[in-house]
Amino acid sequence: SWRFNIIEEAAIGGRGGYEHFKDNGTDIFFLAQWFPRMVAYTDYAGWQHKAFLGRGEFTLEFGDYDVAITVPKGHIVSATGELKNAKQVLTAKQRQRLAQTNAAQPTFIVTPEEALANEAKQHQGQRTWRFSAKKVRDFAWASSEKFIWDAMLHEQPGAEYDQVLALS
């Protein structure tokens, strides 16, 4: 079994933690490099065992991830990969906006007005968001009831995928 305590980012800095907003009691959680994994092995140096010193990156292998993240019901989750259960976590209107995303201009999936209303509402229960990512170095995610979400298709002719969906 394994546990990971999420620490307030202001206390330690780094690549993960949470930020608490005292004015309304909400939080933003953001996590990168948050789970244990084997170190990388290279044919020229063997096992990579250098300590992480904060300026740089770990040596990581590429991998495939299928991740379920359970958060308070009002949270919007941003994560590496493709959202697999939009029907369970987004409203019908938000799913429609996501489906209509194009390369001409950004589209709000969660509007600023919806984010403000969501932030003010008292939510009960939890919701699980599911993501899948193929051939990536790491899996990172963020979660908050404060999030505004927009999306836009990015054209990349000649690449393995002609279009990718950019989310922020």
Residue ranges and their predicted role:
Residues 1-26, 115-130:
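A surface-exposed beta-strand-loop module
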Residues 4-8, 39, 43-44:
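Enriched for extracellular/lumenal, surface-exposed ectodomains of secreted and cell-surface proteins
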Residues 17-38, 86-88:
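Short edge-strand/loop segments of extracellular domains
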Residues 40-42, 46-47, 55-168:
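Hydrophobic helix-coil surface modules that form long, contiguous segments used
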Residues 51:
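Loop-rich catalytic cores of soluble enzymes, especially ATP-dependent carboxylate-amine ligases
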